[in-house]
């Protein structure tokens, strides 16, 4: 797919369309083959777009949606009470084939509910899972679920593992190492759901399941795909982001204490900048909703301009790789024994 069209929910997130429009236009400039559809209050979006010079309007559409979903709104209200919300209209563009992916920084619960309703799940998948890249010592790993499913059955964890493995392959990992996040690596550790999921994964053909991994093993890069329920995954993700921000702030403070530390800091500045870039939450912003019949990427509600750009770029990669269809083909093979 040479010219993907990405539908952007311009009204979602903590900051409304300001950051979203700026990030979208930056991506449009950086990627000549990209086409975008900005969905939301058309007059406001047009005003923000007009403030930027040299915008290629031939690759940009503004689509009006009369409603927006609040960050604290109940998913049921968003689903039933707002048929013309920017989030829903963006998803419907994907469902109708007018766009290849949707990116939203809006209400996570509403996005999950609307995505399942509008796009439907792939055969063999009960619920989508949120997945994102987590930095490790050797690069990064794919972690799922990140909050879409707080409580998960063993079968759901199994499905997540298969989907995560396929995504890792698409991103260039030849034989992804798949692990379950647990409180220990011994077989006796973990709750019943995790133990049952381990049994399903051990019996699966075509999956490189390596067993359990603990939290520190995740950061050492012991696995390429790490699977857990959404409660654990969300806590881990936000703790990781908070830790990265805290470390960067502490290092900056240490190097500002006195003249000597400032001199040392100046010498180490290139390395520190590289470390800060590698660990910056904005660089890893964008969690995919795997298991849908369409590409959907969830951005942090508080994402910066660069952070939202990362989410758009993730959607571009997944749409170009035709992720849903590749997932569908692999799932048919993995689930042919009827285990779903």
From Swiss-Prot:
Keywords, in A-Z order: Cytoplasm, Lipid biosynthesis, Lipid metabolism, Phospholipid biosynthesis, Phospholipid metabolism, Transferase
Organism superkingdom: Bacteria
Any Gene Ontology biological process: fatty acid biosynthetic process
GO MF terms, alphabetically ordered: phosphate:acyl-[acyl carrier protein] acyltransferase activity
Any GO CC annotation of this UniProt entry: cytoplasm
Pathway where it operates: Lipid metabolism; phospholipid metabolism
Main location: cytoplasm
Enzyme class: transferase
InterPro entries: FA_synthesis, Phospholipid_synth_PlsX-like
Key word Transferase present: yes
Location of this chain's protein in the cell: Cytoplasm
UniProt cross-references to Pfam families, sorted A to Z: FA_synthesis
Reaction catalyzed: a fatty acyl-[ACP] + phosphate = an acyl phosphate + holo-[ACP]
Enzyme Commission no: 2.3.1.274
PANTHER family found in the cross-reference section: FATTY ACID/PHOSPHOLIPID SYNTHESIS PROTEIN PLSX (PTHR30100), PHOSPHATE ACYLTRANSFERASE (PTHR30100:SF1)
Assembly with partners or alone: Homodimer. Probably interacts with PlsY.
Cross-referenced NCBIfam families: plsX (TIGR00182)
Similarity annotation: Belongs to the PlsX family.
Function according to Swiss-Prot or TrEMBL: Catalyzes the reversible formation of acyl-phosphate (acyl-PO(4)) from acyl-[acyl-carrier-protein] (acyl-ACP). This enzyme utilizes acyl-ACP as fatty acyl donor, but not acyl-CoA.
Protein name stated in the entry: Phosphate acyltransferase
Upper lineage: Bacteria, Pseudomonadati, Pseudomonadota, Gammaproteobacteria, Pseudomonadales
